[in-house]
């Protein structure tokens, strides 16, 4: 009996010694009792499934015994590339039990992440597009190659997007809602604004790229880290099954306190071949203290003003890769029209849009894109900030690049296994990342919040006015000067039903979508 007791105590001591670290987040705003658990890289699918089964049993036992937390349990599961993990609401004893599993890498408190933009009243004209295609400030035209990002998909990981805004011309779709608020729209305006800069017909850089809305922040512009990691996971899987991660860009105009879990998720997305543009933050401090800006493999973007100075609010430091226009940027607002915003949130989508543009033009992908952007940029930023290793402002090199790509990639050719015409779609559950886009128009069916969005429908999604409400603590913005929109022939008086039937019915619809996703 004594020997058995000795062995038990020894095993307990070994388990405690090998327990995973439960990270502390003393300076962050945390979500009560919510945690993110990351498994080690060598965790197999069987190990992960076994851990989840064990967790369910342990959690149920602990809650039954103590009954201290309401609505507890696992919420998100992460499984892409080498990264496996999950998030959930657990009591302290359950977290200690989780950390004892030798397959667990670390446990991190769930923290609040916010957008890096702010609404400002301004009547200045939009200047960012002209600046990134001309060698000097003050130009009035945007010069670009007609390829304009065609064949590239941009994932807006943000507050959602008004996908029906006229500036997107039907190239934007709703993807996923990880906020689980049942509100599949952009109630703040932030995500619609950043998306307009990336792919809008009038406001955008990559004017022919597609866009997928991934909502990870609520209408107040904030959300938990666990949901953002889930949004990254969803985006990678959707890209992998719809054209490939090497033809995908992700923009993250958000950030918060340093998070190992968020940085790890961002790094895994880059490892899968995606390009990630991340806002540096608006605190006029070292960006190295925030996530995901501090992740070395992403392209971290500071903000510049019209005179090529660093914007007064922009973060700085060793994490900065590039600068882009971010002060007084006019772009799309929910419900139609435009508004002006400032922030590194506005700078990052300039980089994401230019990345999509270059990926289509030169065939590059992943981490090579950030290096190419640095090569094409101009060394013109003044007062880049303490410890900032670069003063490079992005530039498209004048339509064709201006400088030759030293390692041009071959033009992608269609796979011989792909049919020349899309096959008829088969019924499937809406919201799966790999669900193909239909060859014929069909009515959309409702999807559950938090699941990948539906394929392009044959009829437009029913629109409704969006509030475009200001961020907390800000006054409502005055409407920016309205730009003439002519997204369809005939202006405001054209026959929409006749236009839709003519251009989006029957065989024309099939041919359009055959090339759209291939």
From Swiss-Prot:
Ranges annotated as biased composition (Pro residues): 405-470, 478-487
Main location: secreted
Catalytic-site annotation from UniProt: 158 (charge relay system), 190 (charge relay system), 345 (charge relay system)
Stretches with biased composition (Polar residues): 282-294, 378-394
Pro-sequence residue ranges: 20-116
Subcellular location field: Secreted
GO biological process: proteolysis
GO MF annotations in UniProt: serine-type endopeptidase activity
Entry-linked PROSITE patterns: SUBTILASE, SUBTILASE_SER
Region (Disordered): 175-198, 282-312, 378-496
Enzyme Commission number(s): 3.4.21.-
Occurrences of domain Inhibitor I9 (ranges): 34-115
Source superkingdom: Eukaryota
Gene3D superfamilies: Peptidase S8 propeptide/proteinase inhibitor I9 (3.30.70.80), Peptidase S8/S53 domain (3.40.50.200)
Sequence ranges assigned to domain Peptidase S8 in this UniProt record: 126-400
Signal peptide: 1-19
Residue positions with a glycan: 233, 251
Keywords: Glycoprotein, Hydrolase, Protease, Secreted, Serine protease, Signal, Virulence, Zymogen
CDD domains assigned: Peptidases_S8_PCSK9_ProteinaseK_like
GO CC list: extracellular region
Cross-referenced PANTHER family: ALKALINE PROTEASE 1-RELATED, PEPTIDASE S8
Role: Secreted subtilisin-like serine protease with keratinolytic activity that contributes to pathogenicity.
Family per record: Belongs to the peptidase S8 family.
Protein name: Subtilisin-like protease 1
